[in-house]
Amino acid sequence: MAFGKSKNRRRQDAAQQKEAVRGAVRSQGPRALKVLGLTLGTGLLVWGGAALREWTLTSPRFELEAVSFSGLQRASRVELLRLAALTKGQNLWTLDVDALERAMDQHPWLRTVEVTRRFPNRVSVEVTEHTPVAMAVLGELYVLDEEGEPFKRVTPGDGLDLPLVTGLDREGYVADPAAARERLRSALAVASAYARLSPDQAEQLSEVRLEAQSLALVTASGQEVRLGEGDSEVKLQRLARVRRELGARGLAAEIIHLDNRARPGWVAVKISSPASERSGASMR
């Protein structure tokens, strides 16, 4: 009997172990399957991502076919493509847009540049160029934009016919660029007002001369107009009236003084003919 009891006990223990295993499977099985599924899913995503990356970097579909430019006037597409080392067949996904913009921005005529990838196989480049409005003597001859920025040296191929701003030197500009640009902007403002109020091509502006406390203009005919300081718009309107009066009398002026500080309304004129000179006339 003792042997029979021992055998029954072993059977009971085995049955209990099987039941325990079944219970563990019932309780832990779904969780284990979930973990396994997540592991497999993550693996598939990683593999799929790597495969997708490989495809995007090697597929002919994303090879550069065309580059379009807008805003070009002085700069050329050939120059910009060379600066950026941008060539047909490059993969669009590998292009560094910021690096392309920095490279193209080295061109002296460019004020701003924006590069955009147009998938699957194009790139567009939008540029804004400096607008040349004058030239300045700063040791060498530089081109000025409308902000008074000397953005490039004048080269023979520029083909510019612009007023010349003189009276500043390179040392002064380097020592205080902000103050120098402010003076250049004031000269450009006077040049712009002159062009608007004196459309006569015979008296086209040739030079704006910056002096210590004053400003003078020189025209293409060699006439000098001394504006002094301040009230440039009013003085230029007065200049137009003086020229009309001189023209009506058949006279031409060599120098016109509009810089009388004590009597701002007075105009002194040196007539071109040495035989006659008219000065001190009030032209209010």
Swiss-Prot record:
Residues 1-23 are annotated as: Disordered. GO terms for biological process: cell septum assembly; FtsZ-dependent cytokinesis. Coiled coil: none annotated. Residues 62-130 form the POTRA domain. Keywords: Cell cycle, Cell division, Cell inner membrane, Cell membrane, Membrane, Transmembrane, Transmembrane helix. It holds the Pfam family POTRA_1. Residues 1-10 have a biased composition (Basic residues). One of its GO terms (cellular component) is cell division site. It comes from the Bacteria. It is a single-pass type II membrane protein. InterPro entries: Cell_div_FtsQ/DivIB_C, FtsQ, FtsQ_C_sf, POTRA, POTRA_FtsQ_type. Residues 1-34 are cytoplasmic. Residues 53-284 are periplasmic. The chain crosses the membrane at residues 35-52. It is found in: Cell inner membrane. Belongs to the FtsQ/DivIB family. FtsQ subfamily. Essential cell division protein. This is Cell division protein FtsQ. It comes from Myxococcus fulvus (strain ATCC BAA-855 / HW-1).
